[in-house]
Amino acid sequence: MHQLKKLITVKVIGSGEKTVVLGHGFGTDQSVWKHLVPYLVEDYRVVLYDNMGAGPTNPDYFDFERYASLEGYAYDLLAILEELQIDSCIYLGHSLSSMTGVIASIFRPDLFSKLIMLSASPRFINADDYYGGFEKEDIDQLSQAMDTNYKSWIEGFAPLVIGGDMDSVAVQEFSRTLFNMRPDIALSVFRTIFTFDLRHFLCRVTVPCHIIQSSKDLAVPVAVSEYIHQNLGGKSIVEVISTEGHLPQLSAPEVTIPVLLRHISHDITSNAAP
């Protein structure tokens, strides 16, 4: 971890007996939680970190082989918890990081009291028995567009994912953090995420899971959250919030933050109501 600590920006703030660890998704960094953190610091110890490859990290140290699968990110997360001597945490992961939490919790279930999964998907590409929202050809076209002109790709991709136009603050913020990534790293991470199939991991998860997503998300159809719920190995609950876009914590914080706070503070009860 000492080497990892030099590469990944880890921030620990707040006070409280319980620890909340926040993991961000593709194209963002820990700043994506800026609307949530002020509501946590009085009651919780809060840990924020940047995934390797995110803008604030040193691109020269990005290991393309290590991060060609989510296990690399999961090992980083476990190393952070070990270094900070965290023996139990509430883990809130967005998109990519929600599945990182899934894998890490399989390796070390004792370290996680629960997972909160925001805009999560175990597979983005459709299969015969599964609707992920994309065809392989869609991903190939997006990858090609990224490779051809990264800046132009961001201008088209960011509004679609956020669910707004280029003038919106959330789209501008997502565009900024996307642009901060080195293009070849962004392309590698994009391909890793959009071609993985982690469905087989779900049944091995024993930690309670809170699954939250927007009612309209271009990247994650509502059916995906229900699929996760039905296939997890432990207790789980789904909440679909009346927001649009893949990053509701950024685009609609007034709706999303109260929901996240409720799931952080309340556990799943026997009647599956948070």
Curated annotation (Swiss-Prot):
Any single biological process term in GO: response to strigolactone
Location (main, coarse): nucleus
Recorded phenotype for the gene knockout or disruption: Reduced stigma size with normal terpenoid emission but reduced seeds number per flower. Insensitivity to (-)-germacrene D volatile signal leading to unchanged pistil tube size and lost (-)-germacrene D-mediated SMAX1a degradation.
Entry keyword Nucleus: yes
Sorted UniProt keywords: Cytoplasm, Hydrolase, Nucleus
GO molecular-function terms, A-Z: hydrolase activity
Tissue specificity comment: Strongly expressed in stigma.
Record flagged with keyword tRNA-binding: no
Cross-referenced InterPro entries: AB_hydrolase_1, AB_hydrolase_fold
Regulation: Hydrolysis activity toward yoshimulactone green (YLG), a fluorescent agonist to strigolactone receptor, is inhibited by (-)-germacrene D and GR24, a synthetic strigolactone analog.
Main function: Hydrolase involved in the olfaction of sesquiterpene volatile organic compounds (VOCs) during volatile plant communication in a MAX2 proteins-dependent manner. Acts as a karrikin-insensitive receptor that stereospecifically perceives and binds to (-)-germacrene D, particularly in stigmas, and triggers a signaling cascade influencing plant fitness, as the result of reproductive organ growth-promoting effect; this process involves an interaction with MAX2 proteins (e.g. MAX2A and MAX2B) and the subsequent degradation of SMAX1a, a transcriptional corepressor.
Protein name: Karrikin insensitive 2 receptor IA
Biological source species: Petunia hybrida
